[in-house]
Swiss-Prot record:
Keyword DNA-binding: yes
UniProt note: phenotype after gene disruption: Essential, it cannot be disrupted.
Function: Overexpression leads to many branched and bloated cells, two to three times the size of wild-type cells, and cells that have 1-3 times the normal amount of DNA. Contributes to the accurate cell-cycle control of DNA replication and cellular morphology. Can fully replace its ortholog in C.crescentus.
Catalytic activity: a 2'-deoxyadenosine in DNA + S-adenosyl-L-methionine = an N(6)-methyl-2'-deoxyadenosine in DNA + S-adenosyl-L-homocysteine + H(+)
GO biological process: DNA replication; methylation
Pfam families: N6_N4_Mtase, RAMA
InterPro entries: DNA_methylase_N4/N6 (IPR002941), DNA_methylase_N6_adenine_CS (IPR002052), RAMA (IPR040843), RM_Methyltransferase (IPR001091), SAM-dependent_MTases_sf (IPR029063)
Protein's recorded name: DNA methyltransferase CcrM
Enzyme kind, highest EC tier: transferase
Length: 376
């Protein structure tokens, strides 16, 4: 079960990781400033939208629209909102690991201001994502287009950031083996997923659908990563993170939201380890040199390798190079040379004989990779 901790407890904590899988009660900037540097893999932020509602909204039948009119969404001016945005973004960057990324979601009311400030602070935008809603709220007055989407910005802490997580192969496989696009179609949160109080009213006015958070976490985190949400609300980020085997840290100042989020997260059952395996491409696999096969004894010096049709042959030398007809070089260079080509993938071109069957040396590389995976 997730715990709820105060800012005072975080500040005087002797153990630096006691805030994992917890909801910190307090102001987001103060809470962020109490966390260790470079301790978070991903930030998902759903900040106040600063809707600037001029009054109550009514449907054509004069029933009241359940819009966001809470105090936490009220700012005296755009300047005040911008100052608040700069403060929490800077605090998030401090806690992000150098390989970490930040997601922020907003509507047309705030996302352009947030995006401009992000770039002013030298965050580096990787993508903007359109969340297209299958069931958006109508424009009741008929004076504008129906607002049917929200925008997400995905960014690294700076332009030179390297090594961030993007599970490209998993996203492609989930999209019927076609590259995942930057426009995502999800319904707004409704039905049994929508948290409601004893009075039947929504617990939180802007609760995000779990499917949206699941895609974000599956795309940009690994099992065991730490996901921070500085505007935790009803705890969607924490619930999805727990289910997907990620750690979470939530920051929230409203006790009613904290209570609802803690109860919600406590009811979540994490998925099994085997279920959480993420598909990876060859680029994500550990690099194995051909010489490693020789050093490990999988291929012995003096072994004769051929192509699949036995047209070309080469002898394996003790230093991990190949020799053929007075030429010598790497598996790739010699493979290209004997064919008269500019380039060659030696792993799939050269074959070894097992019994009477020719097999690509890439199979032996897989043996080494599997051994490395067991060590990790």
């Amino acid at each position: 079960m997730s715990s709820v901790v105060s800012l005072a407890e975080i500040s005087r904590a002797a153990r630096p990781l006691n805030w994992l899988d917890s909801i910190i009660k307090g102001d987001c900037v103060a809470a962020l400033n109490a966390l260790p540097d470079h301790s978070v893999d991903v930030v998902f932020a759903d900040p106040p939208y600063n809707l600037q509602l001029g009054g109550t909204l009514h449907r054509p039948d004069q029933s009241l629209v359940d819009a966001v009119d809470d105090d936490w969404d009220q700012f005296a001016s755009f300047e005040a909102y911008d100052a608040f945005t700069r403060a929490w973004l800077l605090a998030c960057r401090r806690v992000l690991k150098p390989t970490g990324t930040l997601w922020v979601i907003g509507s047309y009311h705030n996302i352009f201001r947030v995006g401009a400030i992000l770039q002013d602070l030298h965050f580096w935008v990787l993508n903007d994502i359109i969340w297209r809603k299958t069931n958006p709220m109508p424009n009741f007055k008929g004076r504008r287009f129906q607002n049917a989407h929200e925008t997400l910005i995905w960014a690294t802490p700076n332009a030179k950031a390297k090594g961030y997580t993007f599970n490209y192969e998993a996203m492609k496989a989930a999209n019927d083996d076609v590259q995942m696009r930057s426009d995502w179609l999800f319904p707004i949160c409704s039905g049994s997923e929508r948290l409601k109080g004893d009075d039947g009213k929504k617990v939180h006015p802007t609760q995000k659908p779990e499917a949206l958070l699941a895609r974000i976490l599956m795309a940009s985190t690994k099992p065991g990563d730490v996901v921070l949400d500085p505007f935790f609300g009803s705890g969607t980020t924490g619930a999805v993170a727990k289910r997907l085997g990620r750690h979470f840290v939530g920051i929230e100042r409203e006790q009613d939201y904290i209570d609802a989020a803690a109860e919600r997260i406590a009811a979540v059952e994490p998925l099994g380890k085997a279920t959480l395996s993420v598909m990876t491409g060859k680029k994500a696999e550990p690099r194995v040199a051909f010489n490693t096969l020789v050093e490990s004894g999988l291929i012995k010096p003096g072994t004769v390798l051929t192509d699949a049709k036995r047209r070309y042959s080469a002898i394996v030398r003790a230093d991990g190079t190949l020799a053929s007809g007075g030429e010598a070089g790497s598996i790739h260079r010699l493979g290209a040379k004997v064919q008269g080509l500019d380039a060659c993938n030696g792993w799939t071109f050269w074959h070894f004989e097992e019994g009477s069957v020719l097999k690509p040396i890439d199979e032996l590389r897989s043996v080494i990779r599997n051994d490395l995976a067991k060590l990790n």
